[in-house]
A protein has these predicted regions:
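Hydrophobic alpha-helical signal-anchor/transmembrane segments
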Residues: 1-73, 94, 129, 165, ...
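Glycine- and small-hydrophobic-enriched helix-loop-helix hairpins
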Residues: 70-167
Length: 170
């Protein structure tokens, strides 16, 4: 969930924040409202960080999904211009906004450090948790294996994502 939210902390650090919140809000609740206030403070301290984390993950997912069609179009345009898939990922990471730029930049760095392209893309899907992204990555993997016009496939996927988003809004 921490990666889904884009938070650069580990689970141990997050649990420390929860623990400190429980203690701090419990003490404050006791000082200002006796034992019942302490119980309320402990409860709030235990659940508030998870609620904030969940909300941040939801916002980030919505932001990435909102950028996905444009990101795929940037990659497709770069492929049409004759660039390799990695160069196209680099273009997307530079041209699009955060948080998608950071995620695609991370994929590119992982591949450059020796990670298999399919594995890096699958890790992206795991981190983000978007069904549309999973569909796009599956299309990329299939197209890379069987060959063909990846730019055309990405444009089709991007257009389909846009159409689905339009239907969701209605």
């Amino acid at each position: 969930k921490l990666e889904h939210a884009g938070w650069a902390i580990g689970s141990g650090e997050f649990l420390t924040i929860v623990f400190v919140g429980v203690i701090l809000l419990g003490v404050l609740g006791f000082v200002f409202a006796s034992a019942l206030g302490a119980v309320a403070g402990v409860t709030l301290g235990a659940f508030a960080p998870f609620a904030v984390l969940s909300r941040a993950a939801g916002r980030r997912l919505a932001a990435i999904q909102g950028q996905l069609a444009d990101t795929l179009m940037v990659i497709a345009s770069s492929l049409r211009a004759g660039h390799s898939f990695l160069q196209s990922l680099d273009s997307a990471a530079k041209e699009i906004d955060q948080p998608a730029a950071g995620e695609f930049g991370r994929v590119l760095r992982e591949i450059r450090l020796g990670r298999d392209t399919d594995d890096a893309l699958e890790a992206l899907v795991e981190r983000v948790g978007s069904q549309d992204l999973e569909w796009a990555v599956t299309a990329i993997e299939v197209q890379r294996k069987i060959g063909g016009n990846l730019a055309e496939v990405l444009e089709t996927v991007a257009n389909t994502i846009r159409e689905r988003e339009t239907l969701r809004r209605q």
